[in-house]
Amino acid sequence: MMNMITVIGFGSFGRKVVNFIKNKEPITIIDKNIDDADDLVKEGVTVIVGDATQDEVLKKAKIENADIVLILTNEPEVNRRIAERVCELSPNSYKIARAIPRYPELYMGLNIDKIINILESGAKDIAKEVEDAKLKRKLMQLKSVLIEGKKRCMKLEKTEEEKKAPLLILTHINPDPDAIASAMALKTLAERWGVDSDIAYGGNIGYDENKAMINLLGIKLLNVEDIDLDNYCVIAVIDTSTSKQLPIELPNIDIIIDHHNNTDLTAKYMDVRPEVGATASILTQYLMELDIEPSRNLATALFYGIQSDTDYFKRETSKLDFEAAAYLQSYIDASILNMIENPEISTEVMEVLAKAVMNRRVVKGNIALAYVGEISNRDALPKAADFLLKMEGISTTFVFGIVGDEIHISARTKDLRLNLGEILNKAFGGGGHQTAAAAKIPLGIFKAVSDKEALRKLVEEAIRAKILEVIGIKEEEK
């Protein structure tokens, strides 16, 4: 859901403000004289040339649809008239107006949210104010969706047995710490607004760290197989915005909060920010804005979610991720965090690590590929891929094995020239990040092979050949 911003007054100061915000949200500019209108239009800015004190000009700019309005002319009487008309035509927008020296009561009696003195605040400060206003409006929208859903549920309830929990918070399939922590945070926000909720997931809770997180923090999750969608009036999807990652088919989605960029779902409320490293950072920002202090368990979960999704702040990390982590630092339980990060390693995982080391085949001196055979715990594969990456001279690893009727592949790299997400997507329809990715493919015709040694050779050769082909390494170059 994009915020529509209208800037009225495109003088030197208005121009500076627009330069700070024009690449982030749809912008409409209104002024009597705009010399470079054609250039602005090419940059995606909507330009309205006219007198903003006139209703027809404001309506032409669709002022009624504006989320944020900035009134930035330097003429006091003009600003007052514009503010009056904007308050009338766009009552729900967040309004920021320029203060004029010697006119301290210029906007008295008008519903102006913020008055800015440009002698004290620069264009960058105004841009920051716009960002704050956008967040405030987003949270108002989120609250509205939740409250309306609760009201619908209350109308439907007839007896105690028919009582509905208004909100279902759904993570992506096989949820990771970021998804789980973000769901916990949304549940906390909803409770603050008087809305009960359940958290549900599909697939498996993988990795020893994830299981330790759930057990140590006492996180209550429901499996989608054990819920009835008809029992909920609001559906929120967390840490994914693509249908492929949903654990259950949903007729409608009310809320989507995510940080991935492969969006194909829509909802009444959407906050999708690909530039942010973790969804937990977005939810932490919500808590900060609403002055909600997280419990020790919630803070620990959110901190670990940010940490794990950004690979300890080394992968696709934004300013917000650092700010969120810094805020959470004083609330976390360090001893529990340490136990989550360092769970006991099972015997099977140790055996897979050993097989990966023993079976590794090194290509071009720094790419290690290892087939580990048939395993029951797919989560051992990324651990093995990480483990091989620590070996001297190795910069990229691919570890693969058979889990049930599928071949699972996990990859890691320190080589900035490679994008593992793209490589595994092209090779096997998988995905992930530049430095870490995964894929799975049906075992297919290989299921008919009963001899384990023959199966090993077939799978190892087929997977290795496809990976090297996509990377661009020819057989004779190995």
Curated annotation (Swiss-Prot):
Limits of the RCK N-terminal domain: 2-120
Segment forming the signal sequence: none
Pfam families, per the entry: DHH, DHHA1, TrkA_N
Swiss-Prot/TrEMBL GO biological process terms: potassium ion transport
GO MF entries: nucleic acid binding
UniProt-recorded name of the protein: Uncharacterized protein MJ1633
